[in-house]
């Protein structure tokens, strides 16, 4: 499903998408990946995203699901960047593990050294929209900006709640010279109506309007990204 800038914060983003709503078995799958020392579960989320969002065929290597490369993929993402972790004690970054299968399926390089979290603040879970915005303000910075210049970037996160985190990441990437940033996550939380009333950073970048959230994901509802 494509996310709407009328319902989520998509400041400085060309757009955003997630195949599922964050509830039921989807929520349990994300929590397993995040809180049960299960990096393999995070990679399976990425395999599912490659299949649902890009049409990658899933094959099994033993008990491990793997995405096949997407033939004829020519969208033009030049870099895949995971949202940096807020909890370094976990030992692995869930979005980075999710991004690995996507990188393999699309043939797009995955980089973990270009977008950095420079301050560790409160977890975003349970915060209001205003608290989330304050919490991520100045939380990210870029490294090696010459490697970001004029690049079309695919940003990966596990869950998009209000869009505050992905918007903050996109903001610093564009400031570093990136051409465009598109965000994808495994799931999205039902949006808060107030999200669209918050002003974006005033650096001249705008966000195009997208269609409203689709009612429910279908396995054959692939996106032409």
What are these regions (language model features)?
Residues 1-156, 161-225:
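Glycine-rich phosphate/pyrophosphate-handling loop used in enzymes and phosphotransfer proteins
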């Amino acid at each position: 499903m494509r996310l709407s800038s009328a319902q989520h914060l998509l400041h400085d983003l060309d757009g955003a998408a997630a195949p599922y709503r964050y509830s039921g078995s989807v929520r349990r799958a994300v929590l397993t990946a995040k809180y049960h020392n299960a990096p393999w579960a995070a990679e399976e989320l990425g395999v599912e995203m490659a299949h649902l969002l890009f049409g990658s065929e899933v094959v099994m290597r033993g008990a491990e699901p793997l995405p096949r490369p997407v033939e004829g993929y020519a969208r033009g993402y030049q870099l895949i960047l995971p949202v940096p972790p807020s909890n370094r004690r976990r030992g692995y970054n869930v979005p980075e593990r999710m991004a690995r299968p996507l990188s393999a399926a699309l043939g797009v390089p995955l980089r973990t050294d270009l977008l950095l979290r420079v301050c560790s603040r409160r977890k975003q879970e349970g915060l209001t929209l205003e608290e989330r915005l304050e919490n991520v303000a100045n939380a990210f910075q870029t490294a090696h900006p010459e490697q970001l210049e004029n690049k079309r970037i695919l940003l990966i996160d596990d869950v998009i709640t209000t869009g505050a985190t992905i918007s903050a990441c996109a903001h610093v990437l564009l400031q570093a010279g990136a051409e465009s940033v598109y965000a994808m996550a495994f799931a999205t939380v039902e949006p808060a109506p107030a999200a669209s009333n918050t002003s974006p950073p005033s650096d001249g970048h705008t966000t195009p309007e997208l269609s409203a959230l689709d009612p429910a994901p279908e396995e054959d509802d692939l996106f032409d990204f």
